[in-house]
Amino acid sequence: MTANFIRALAVKSFDDPDRRRCPDKAEFDLVTVDDYSVARLILAPGWRWSVSAKPAELTNFCEHHHLGYCISGQLEVETADGGRSTIHAKDTYALPPGHDEWVVGEEPFVGVEFLGAASFGRPRSFGMHALI
């Protein structure tokens, strides 16, 4: 396990993110505090990774790790091996590489991600994450 250290006080708002990108039916707001990246995801009703992101990612499934907290909405996740779960408001979640995901219902999915967020702004990442 890696040791994590916070070196300085840092406070930032998603209302004034370091980066904001709005690919198909999504908004990603990224802030960096100290050396840590945190992202707010807003996924609109009808958003599905295999439809909205797969064409840019060029992989059969999302190959990123995600560790997050759902603020509102619902997100259905299905892994490549057939595992399936629904993320609801107030749930924490960990998603391994090799999954599809989609918004359930008519309410946007709003989440905050702590692992996986750094790839949202990385210029040499795979597809969708490189665009954010």
Roles of regions detected by a PLM:
Residues 48-62:
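Catalytic core of non-heme Fe(II) oxygenases with the double-stranded beta-helix
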Residues 48-49, 73-78, 101:
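Short beta-strand segments in beta-sandwich/barrel cores
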Residues 39, 83-85, 110:
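Short beta-strand segments
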Residues 96-121:
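Ligand-binding loop in jelly-roll beta-barrel domains
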Residues 59-77:
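Short, conserved beta-strand element in jelly-roll/cupin
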Residues 41-43, 68, 93:
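Conserved GNAT-family N-acetyltransferase fold
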Residues 1-42, 50-51, 126-132:
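A short, N-terminal "cap"/entry segment at the start of jelly-roll beta-barrel domains
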